[in-house]
Each structure stands twice: as C-alpha cells, then as structure tokens.
Amino acid sequence: MSEALLNAGRQTLMLELQEASRLPERLGDDFVRAANIILHCEGKVVVSGIGKSGHIGKKIAATLASTGTPAFFVHPAEALHGDLGMIESRDVMLFISYSGGAKELDLIIPRLEDKSIALLAMTGKPTSPLGLAAKAVLDISVEREACPMHLAPTSSTVNTLMMGDALAMAVMQARGFNEEDFARSHPAGALGARLLNKVHHLMRRDDAIPQVALTASVMDAMLELSRTGLGLVAVCDAQQQVQGVFTDGDLRRWLVGGGALTTPVNEAMTVGGTTLQSQSRAIDAKEILMKRKITAAPVVDENGKLTGAINLQDFYQAGII
C-alpha cells in the first residue's frame, strides 16, 4: 500500500512538471501585450474565475497586489449581482477559465465592452469565446490532467498559478518594484521589520542615553555605565558632538592598569568609536555592530550630534535578526 501511494504521488508530480515545462515556450506577443496593458492600467486589475480557477485567481490577485499592482478578486456570480459596479473603465479584468466558455461570460463580456474595460484571458482554449473577446490570451492548456480519471483540475491549475506568477513577476520587474516597496505592503511581517525600521525608530532616547561630558571623570562615566546598563557611555563636547566612547572594556583595562577614578574620562575613553546614523536602516546598522563585534553604539544625527543609543537587543526585540 505504501509503495502504491508513493508511486501515485510521484506520478502526479511528474505529470504536472511535464505540463508546466511547456509554458515558457508559449510566452510571446500576447504575454507582452497583457503585461503592458497592466503596466499602463490607471485603475486596478480585477481578477475573476469560477471553481478552481477562482481559487487560483484569488492567489494571483493577492500576488499582484503585494508586488506593486493594485488588484482584487471578484467572483463572476457576485459580479452579475451588483459587483460589476466595482469595476471602472480605467480597470483591467483578468478572467480565468480553462474552457473559456463559462456561461457567466455571456453576460459579463458585454458589460465590460460597454465600459471599455480591457479584458485579458487566461484559458486552455485560446479560440473559445473568452479567448476571442480578450485583448491578450495567456495559454494554460495541458495535454492531460494529473488526475487518474483526467477530471480533477490538477496540471491545469498548476499551469494557471505559474502563468499568474510569471505575469506578476514580469510586471513587478518592469515597475522597478524593490525590497523596500515590498516591505511597505507587508509592514507587520519580518521583512517589514527588517526593511522599514530606521535606527531612530528603535533607539533609546532622552534619559536612557548613556552620556557624559568631556570634562567628566572616569568615576562619572562608571556611574553612568551602571545607571543605563548599555555597556558604553558616549563622551560628548559642549555641542553634543560625540568625541569618543567609554565602554565596560575600557573601564576594566583602566582599573587593571592602575588608573585613578578621578582622571578625566577623555584619557581613558576610546577616541572616535563607532556611531550610527539615526536615519540609517536598522538592518544596516545591526550589520555594522555585528561586523565590528560590538554590542552597542551611540546614535547621531546628520550633523554628528548625539540623539540616542542602541544595542543589539533593541534590534532583536524589533524582529531584526
């Protein structure tokens, strides 16, 4: 029984892969035309389909929407009972139907023509009523479904999903859609945290900033280290410019070397030291700390003035790992 199940599963995958392998050679003028229609669309892409085509259509609409092309899904039955009012003349409709002969099309196509809405077809029958009415036809035909009875949509739904991905990715690249654009559509996700957060969003402010003046003593800096627990203190001049940092390591080395606590901190600090820009991406700032093998750093503005402090734990808590 186990071997029979494995063979059935493998056979299904092989058949679907075989059918999908024919898709690249079908991309041509119609694919380019469909992509250009979407690129020049001033409204939204409205995806529609029935049954399994509808389920795949929802995913295609979601992929378009998350990669820079406003899109949503409308069920054909709902469209014919009021939702056609959601579709405007500046929109584009992508209708998915393997047979290309869904009865709802008899009523939908004239309404689209009345509104001068461009129709794109994703079908296994390019010469069907859907294919003939469309401005561009994306051929998702298969020689056979992976279903042993040749009935359940299997190979054809894989082809539909892949063609939708191909179209969405081509349009995305043509738009110049990048990682930061993607993150703006996914602000609650890990990618959003990594790419949208700036250092100033995460840094510690006001009294939580460990800092002493250049004229302070090593004792003053030690007390500030203890108060904030960040592992470093920013040493600033009268204009709040960071002149150096005094770290736990600096303190240990100073005491082991017999240095006095009353000595000015500028004699014991690390001159210069690493600072982070407040407007930098948090992910880039974290990489700087990791590369330099330090756990914290002062944060400065574009003029070099101290505005905050941050450590690795602040990044981790924000989901930037």
UniProtKB/Swiss-Prot annotation:
One of its GO terms (molecular function) is arabinose-5-phosphate isomerase activity. It catalyses: D-arabinose 5-phosphate = D-ribulose 5-phosphate. Residues 203-261, 269-321 form the CBS domain. It holds the Pfam family CBS. GO terms for biological process: keto-3-deoxy-D-manno-octulosonic acid biosynthetic process; protein homotetramerization; single-species biofilm formation. ATP binds at G49, I50, G51, K52, S53, G54. Optimum pH is 8.25. CDD domains: CBS_pair_SIS_assoc (cd04604), SIS_Kpsf (cd05014). Zn(2+) binds at H75. Catalyzes the reversible aldol-ketol isomerization between D-ribulose 5-phosphate (Ru5P) and D-arabinose 5-phosphate (A5P). It appears that the physiological function of G-API may be to synthesize the regulatory molecule A5P, which in turn participates in the induction of the gut operon through an unknown mechanism. It is also able of sustaining the biosynthetic pathway of 3-deoxy-D-manno-octulosonate (KDO), a unique 8-carbon sugar component of lipopolysaccharides (LPSs). Homotetramer. This is Arabinose 5-phosphate isomerase GutQ. The gene is gutQ.
